[in-house]
Amino acid sequence: MDVSEGGVTVSVPTASGGGEGAADDVFFNATQELNRDLTVATLAAFREREPRAASYLDAMTASGIRGVRAANAGWDVTMADVDADAVELATSNLARNGLDGEVVARDANSLLHDHDRVLDVVDIDPFGSPMPFADAAFANARNLVCVTATDTAPLCGAHFESGVRKYSATPRNTNYHAEMGLRILLGALARTAARYDVGVTPILSHVSDHYVRTYLELDHRATDANAAVEQVGHVYHCQQCLSRDHEYGLVAAPRAECPRCGGHQVLTAGPLWLGPAHEEAFAASVREQLTREMGEASQAFHLLQTIEGELHEPTHYDQHRLYSQWGEPAVGMAEFLDQLRDAGLRASRTHFGGTTFKTDGGLAEVEAAVL
């Protein structure tokens, strides 16, 4: 069947039930249109930031729709897949749109280690964890690595042992599980890049539906790698009163008791990324690159607008969860945030949920401001 998206039309597999999906081992995910719209807009914004960036690798291309859209936006595209049917389909989709590009039947790691190729932007969008491809990406990409992770249960700690194995970290299943997953992923990626003397800067990150997506700008100096590793640390979360604090460093110092309530159910999470997960100005520039032909432009616009205003403090709170903990009825979010600001705290909404917020104050300060 044919799908039109972002100014291109491609053939995609038809699942056995007649819908869009997987057939003959070639996968197409219609629900990832937001992800692809944001990818194209991010590539456009990044090219303004780094005009020399020209080449783009869609490392797990499947139907090729992401790579075709990148080629349509003017990128020198290479599309790769280990499946011969996917390579044939992606090649056909490039041709039917009158676009140039190369489609190769190669494993992503093998292709990335081919030093005859210069790849400015590498896009890793596997099914599951991206970590098996992270070393090759950071060792060989020049400017930008784009990463999707769909294994959100291991990342957020719901599948604890799997998260420990895949990300060499301790993820904890908290009421801010989406941000936990994002920061566990960023921490693992930063540590991987540092092995190759590459420093990463997250210029845009988001958690949408059941995936985590981040765009990491690269700097190829050991000092930059050191600086990125310095943004990694641990979060200490009290299961009883929901307070938490954090500290930088790869060595954890577990808390015997909560400094706020004196409870002894304090979880240690990490190593994870404690630094900013986005740059406000870059998020704004991505928003400016959204076009009417993008099917999820409206959702992308509002997502980016929220991210622009989101504070960088690690870990958000859920307002409804706090009021439930306090045994009080929740007020409206706008009123709630105004109360925090009136008390001298910085506060913002977050893109992690409609009742989530960030603040530079501790939980005791939040409680004093609103109760």
Curated annotation (Swiss-Prot):
InterPro entries: SAM-dependent_MTases_sf (IPR029063), Trm1 (IPR002905), TRM1_arc_bac (IPR022923), tRNA_met_Trm1_C (IPR042296). It is an enzyme of class 2 (transferase). Pfam families: TRM. Residues 1-370 form the Trm1 methyltransferase domain. One of its GO terms (molecular function) is tRNA binding. It comes from the Archaea. It catalyses: guanosine(26) in tRNA + 2 S-adenosyl-L-methionine = N(2)-dimethylguanosine(26) in tRNA + 2 S-adenosyl-L-homocysteine + 2 H(+). Keywords: Metal-binding, Methyltransferase, RNA-binding, S-adenosyl-L-methionine, Transferase, tRNA processing, tRNA-binding, Zinc. The keyword Transport does not apply. Zn(2+) binds at C238, C241, C258, C261. S-adenosyl-L-methionine binds at R36, R66, D81, D107, A108. The keyword Iron does not apply. Gene3D superfamilies: N2,N2-dimethylguanosine tRNA methyltransferase, C-terminal domain, Vaccinia Virus protein VP39. Transmembrane segments: none annotated. GO terms for biological process: tRNA N2-guanine methylation. Its EC number is 2.1.1.216. NCBIfam families: PRK04338.1-1, TRM1. Belongs to the class I-like SAM-binding methyltransferase superfamily. Trm1 family. Dimethylates a single guanine residue at position 26 of a number of tRNAs using S-adenosyl-L-methionine as donor of the methyl groups. This is tRNA (guanine(26)-N(2))-dimethyltransferase. It comes from Halobacterium salinarum (strain ATCC 700922 / JCM 11081 / NRC-1) (Halobacterium halobium).
